């Protein structure tokens, strides 16, 4: 969970009230956080957040805003945000090239002027940058933030691609380095360059005079990308692969700088094609949708008897604009710096926090039940223990993936796979129908580790099913991969026999026609004359698609069928 370190004096100054340590500890609980340590000597407080959905709280400005709003009940306003029907004047432009749109598509920015950066302010900004990029940004893969002195930048800015031979002087270095050299030798390149695996073009941020701002999300340039104490005019940009996450991150930083005393000047981003919010977006941009909440639903879940007016007042203590037109419903508008309202229940939780947990009496459950594992979970655990006992290491993968990994590299038509409508990124456009592509992808990036490699996963897969009412069917599958130059069909056949022996299940095999396997070295697994899975040596063609140079054997089997 995210941990931040902030100056206590700055926090209290922004709150506008001298709270005792006890009062501070109590009110910080409303942010789903707790104080780990109070360092009186260095004037610092260490806070751990128990929720990753509130990145707006990971700074002294954001936390102070939350506490101040909770105490006053006044919803903060930010008049520099654009909306669909109310676009702000912009003071700079960013042009996105079609080439970079397919690599790391989204970038937004704004200008901040009017304050002098002191040491503590700069430290707070750098910490926010790191927390947003690392925690919320999934180690810069989802989003990453860059900060610059705008005095050195000539607008408009161009967000383009470059080859691995392109050179500039990166931050922390005194000599020019190519993109390839940065990826291999610069500390940030070594840490984050895996974001750009299997690409031959890289993202680059240039100003109008072709000065390099940064190689996002890896490293800024030394000449323009150095922010220091005494700077007054800032340019902030956020790049990412998720449109809403990128917009939200920029909004959070804009609100923080505004609360620090900066004047926020919007910047327009122009994309090569339409996005969910248009081809041109002036940022900071308010994109969140309102929610309609039923009063009875709130009271039923909380065991309360609150009116719509009561609920609206409680929500305003958390910075949420709320109003009602009828006594049985009300509407909320999420704050510009939040996007964690996915369901009515999320709003009900906020009502409870706004009312105060101490105002709800605890009750013992009226019904007594005993929980237990489902049969499929018990069986899965048995299979998992057997795999670990046979020397395999368990993996856990996402259920979503790309067309490239699930279809093209596997050399299948993919007609049975389920696709996601309007995916935000090509990396998550299909629901997996097999675990094997994930195992092969892991093997493709593991060539530097000693062989043999033996990995497995027990997880869900989904396929189209025209017979069922939903049109889909979900299975629990076991899949494993063995990689070594000595492995062959005999080794995996022996392992399959051992697995079924310990499960006390009889099985038969017949030659498989799947193009996943080398001809004559793949087999279907039949239990009670029903095909439940397959195993064999992976075809060199498919191994080459994944960039794997070592022979691999794989198995995948439906464990629902084994249990039945």
From Swiss-Prot:
Keywords: Aminoacyl-tRNA synthetase, ATP-binding, Cytoplasm, Ligase, Magnesium, Metal-binding, Nucleotide-binding, Protein biosynthesis. Its EC number is 6.1.1.20. GO terms for molecular function: ATP binding; magnesium ion binding; phenylalanine-tRNA ligase activity; RNA binding. Residues 286-362 form the B5 domain. GO terms for biological process: phenylalanyl-tRNA aminoacylation. It is found in: Cytoplasm. It comes from the Bacteria. The keyword GTP-binding does not apply. Disulfide bonds: none annotated. Mg(2+) binds at residues 340, 346, 349-350. One of its GO terms (cellular component) is phenylalanine-tRNA ligase complex. Its cofactor is Mg(2+). Tetramer of two alpha and two beta subunits. This is Phenylalanine--tRNA ligase beta subunit. It comes from Borrelia recurrentis (strain A1).
